[in-house]
């Protein structure tokens, strides 16, 4: 079979949908902790969101990611798998072969996937965060107002994903959809290296030599551990990205990545860049486990294989 395979894109779409459903509630908590105020620690944030917004508050802004992140993950996994396969085959000079992967192949393929992910995922992440951050504590802090109850007739800045897109384009231009993209690039390029590479090596390490491929249990465990590692280490730049993207809900106070880092450090110290690291790592495990398991099982079904095959 040639190096380019569409099955990877289809399997990535299914895995992406599974990861959104599993991970969005904790993603909401993570975003509120990083870009909002008045939430304290993780458990305090969960209690505040539930008390003020009920269970629906944890799923705020999920419709757009569910429709779009599935496509986003489809592209990321498709690009990674096909790039890695292309590099491995041409390194050995056998385009139709299945040569062993090297660390350099995985590293370069992960970096390519990280760059591509920003072009497609930047607007998706921005809209998700803008919808998640339509909360009273966040608005009061950014407008310098004392905390008060929301008036019944008071409307949020965005009425939904479509209204959010049109409002951003109207007020900030097309470039507004890519606010925080530079921080996202600094997060995702190393982040995907620490996502795909640990997964590949962990799944191979867990799998007995007699097996032709990792079992679903091995995929779930390796995927979850890779997600926890990747999201945990990506937290500092994830904080900067979230703040830059949430900044435009009511006003813009950051001029760019360096200004956001400087202001955040001056006001809240070094610890601010590790805000949400616990929920990031905890959320990263089930979300990535669902992502890789959905990807591998659907790829197995599409190809008619009897063993799961790593990307």
From Swiss-Prot:
The chain crosses the membrane at residues 9-29, 61-81, 107-127, 189-209, 217-237, 277-295. Its main location: mitochondrion. It is a multi-pass membrane protein. The keyword Transmembrane helix applies. One of its GO terms (molecular function) is transmembrane transporter activity. PROSITE patterns: SOLCAR (PS50920). Solcar repeats lie at residues 3-86, 101-205, 214-301. The keyword Kinase does not apply. One of its GO terms (cellular component) is mitochondrial inner membrane. Disulfide bonds: none annotated. SUPFAM superfamilies: Mitochondrial carrier. Keywords: Membrane, Mitochondrion, Mitochondrion inner membrane, Repeat, Transmembrane, Transmembrane helix, Transport. It is found in: Mitochondrion inner membrane. Belongs to the mitochondrial carrier (TC 2.A.29) family. This is Solute carrier family 25 member 48. The gene is SLC25A48.
């Amino acid at each position: 079979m040639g190096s380019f395979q569409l099955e990877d894109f289809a399997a990535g779409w299914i895995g992406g949908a599974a990861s959104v459903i599993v991970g969005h509630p904790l993603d909401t908590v993570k975003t509120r902790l990083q870009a909002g105020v008045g939430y304290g620690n993780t458990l305090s944030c969960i209690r505040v969101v539930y008390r003020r917004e009920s269970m629906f508050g944890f799923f705020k802004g999920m419709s757009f990611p569910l429709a779009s992140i599935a496509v986003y993950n489809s592209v990321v996994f498709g690009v990674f798998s096909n790039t890695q396969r292309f590099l491995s085959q041409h390194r050995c000079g056998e385009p139709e072969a299945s040569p062993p992967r090297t660390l350099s192949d995985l590293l370069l393929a992960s970096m390519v996937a990280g760059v591509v992910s920003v072009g497609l995922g930047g607007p998706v992440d921005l809209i998700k965060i803008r919808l998640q951050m339509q909360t009273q504590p966040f608005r009061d802090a950014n407008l310098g107002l004392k905390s008060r109850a929301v008036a019944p007739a008071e409307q949020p800045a965005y009425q939904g994903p479509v209204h959010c897109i049109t409002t951003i384009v109207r007020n900030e231009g097309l470039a507004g959809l890519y606010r925080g993209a530079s921080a996202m690039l600094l997060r995702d390029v190393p982040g995907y290296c620490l996502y795909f590479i640990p997964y590949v090596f962990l799944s191979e390490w867990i799998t007995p030599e007699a097996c032709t491929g990792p079992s679903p249990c091995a995929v779930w465990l390796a995927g979850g551990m890779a997600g926890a590692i990747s999201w945990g280490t990506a937290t500092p730049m994830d904080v900067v990205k979230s703040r830059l993207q949430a900044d435009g809900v009511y006003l813009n106070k950051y001029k760019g990545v360096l200004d956001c880092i400087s202001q955040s450090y001056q006001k809240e110290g070094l610890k601010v860049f590790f805000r949400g690291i616990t929920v990031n790592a905890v959320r990263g495990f089930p979300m990535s486990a669902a992502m890789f398991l959905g990807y591998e099982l659907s790829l197995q079904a599409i190809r008619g294989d009897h063993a799961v095959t790593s990307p």
